Structure formats: C-alpha cells, structure tokens
Amino acid sequence: MWFRSLAVSACTVGVLGALSQKFAPTALFHSAIRKSSLVEQSDMKVELLPALTDNYMYLLIDEETKEAAIVDPVEPQKVVDAVKKHGVKLKTVLTTHHHWDHAGGNEKLVKLMPGLTVYGGDDRVGALTQKVTHYNTFKVGSLNVKCLFTPCHTSGHICYFVTKENSTEAPAVFTGDTLFVAGCGKFFEGTADEMYKALIEVLGRLPPETRVYCGHEYTINNLKFARHVEPNNEVIRTKLAWAKEKYDNGEPTIPSTVAEEFTFNPFMRVREKSVLEHAGTSDPIEAMRSIRKEKDGFRVPKN
C-alpha cells in the first residue's frame, strides 16, 4: 500500500450547519488546507475526499471491474468530479448513519447520478433504497461488502467491511462515527454497553490488518485525550507526534488498522489495567462509560 497526494481542497467552512455542529466535536481543520489521498492496493483503491470542516467521504473502487461506491457523500459535486477523474462507474452509496454531515448529500447525488443504490441501516437516511442490518452482504463489482450493525452513536449506525475473495491485501472497514483513529463517537442514541459491543466484539474481531477509514479527522485531539488517560503509553506519544506532522503538511491521518487501535485508542483498551485504573473500575463497560463522559468535557491542551 502507498499513499499519493492528489489534490488540495480548502475546507468548506460554515457549511456544516447547526445540525451537524451538534454532532461534531471541535474541528481541528477549520481553516487548514487538506489534501485528498489515494490508497492503492491490487484489489481496490480508496480515495479519501475531505469534506466540510473535518469529514471524509471515501470513493471505493473495485480494480477488477472499475465499479465504485461512495461512502457518506455529503458534498456531491466533489464525488461527481472524483468519479469522472477515475473514469469509474459509480453504482452504490454506503451511508454509515443519518446525521446531516454524512447523509445530507444523498438526495442531491441521486439527482446528479440517477440509478444509484443507497444503502443504510436507518429509515432516517436520505434517499435510502436498501435498508440493511447486521451481516447483510452485497457486492461492489467483485468486492464483497458486509454490513456491521454498530448502534450507539445513532441507533441505526452501520459500518461496512470490504474484502476481495482470494486477495492477499488488507481488508477495509468504513466506520463512520463509531470508531475514529484513537477515539469513538458520542453516545447520542446508545449506551456504553452498545459501544463496547461495537468496538470490542464487532470491529475488534475483524482481521488485525484491516484498514480503518473513519468519518472525521479528529486524530490529534483524540490522541491528546488518550495521552491523558494513559500518560505512560509511549505508543500514544509516538502516534501523536506523527499525527501532528501529518497535520502540518495538510495530510490525512487515515487509515489506521484494527491492530493499531488496540495500542493507542482508550475506547478499544478498556480491558487494559492502565485504562481501568484511570476510570477507577474493574469493569470494562463501566470504564467505557466513564472515559466517554470524561472526554465529552475534556479541555484539549494546546500541546
């Protein structure tokens, strides 16, 4: 795998709107220049398309058939432009959840590109044509897509796990606002028990090499909180220094891998002694509840 900077796009500041502002923590990239990136494998390509202030859309391309899917296309024109640039056939929309900053472009995109199948796990998803639930499967070209039901951030949240039969390349998972690099989404419509199941029992059981493509660029702030939870974790400090360098270059910190998340993400590490001690409990689910509540009120330090 390698990354190639493709284009520079300015953050769309002020477009997010009141609804999406409610759902997002303080953005790190309000006025920064952010680059899209292309992750290339022999079986699939994934183009990271920055959107709004800190969102990511993902153009998933099957290399065998040149069929494509778009994940959370909140800025439809950027999607249309990327599809034309790659010369692929866009047939599918993968919606992780109904919040405006993820599903808010669906209606416009289906007008710009008629005939799209729009997948999602919630009737609140705009332009929905195919409602899915846990372990539903379908194809994007020759790629296999498995739906993973991960309720908590919203009650209908779906992550999409993508593999290619007989491929030696790493799988991909598009996690929306369930799993971030070094973090997880707020529990707007769920409980600590549900997030524990989503992170540990569902996403955490994917192959460790699985590449994690999340919904937002929150990595630096997440790692600063992780450092607060585990001040002696050198992996966190190293990852934070790396993320700051990426930020300074306007580059994404995505993807991570499932294996990596278990080394620096406090919400994936709720069974670790250091995290349990920080939370003052021996119960991982109570630790999940405690550190999520703590992070909701966490004042991010400058350094």
Curated annotation (Swiss-Prot):
Locate the residues binding substrate: 186-188, 216-218, 292-295
- According to the record, how does the cofactor bind? Binds 2 Zn(2+) ions per subunit.
Q: List the disulfide bonds.
A: none
Q: Which reaction does it catalyse?
A: an S-(2-hydroxyacyl)glutathione + H2O = a 2-hydroxy carboxylate + glutathione + H(+); (R)-S-lactoylglutathione + H2O = (R)-lactate + glutathione + H(+)
This entry's Enzyme Commission designation comes to 3.1.2.6
Annotated Zn(2+) 2 binding sites: 101-102, 177, 216
What does the record give as cofactor? Zn(2+)
Output the Gene Ontology terms for molecular function: hydroxyacylglutathione hydrolase activity; metal ion binding
Give the InterPro entries listed for this entry: Clx_II_MBL (IPR035680), HAGH_C (IPR032282), Hydroxyacylglutathione_Hdrlase (IPR017782), Metallo-B-lactamas (IPR001279), RibonucZ/Hydroxyglut_hydro (IPR036866)
Domain of life of the source: Eukaryota
Q: Name one GO cellular component term.
A: mitochondrion
SUPFAM superfamilies, per the entry: Metallo-hydrolase/oxidoreductase
Q: Name one GO biological process term.
A: methylglyoxal catabolic process to D-lactate via S-lactoyl-glutathione
Alphabetically ordered keywords of this record? Cytoplasm, Hydrolase, Metal-binding, Mitochondrion, Transit peptide, Zinc
Which residues of the sequence carry a binding annotation for Zn(2+) 1?
Answer: 97, 99, 153, 177
Q: What class of enzyme is it?
A: hydrolase
Query: Tell me, how does this one assemble?
Result: Monomer.
What does it do? Answer: Thiolesterase that catalyzes the hydrolysis of S-D-lactoyl-glutathione to form glutathione and D-lactic acid.
Per its UniProt record, what NCBIfam families does this chain match?
A: GSH_gloB
To which protein family does this belong?
Belongs to the metallo-beta-lactamase superfamily. Glyoxalase II family.
Output this protein's name: Hydroxyacylglutathione hydrolase, mitochondrial
Q: What is the lineage of its organism?
A: Eukaryota, Metazoa, Chordata, Craniata, Vertebrata
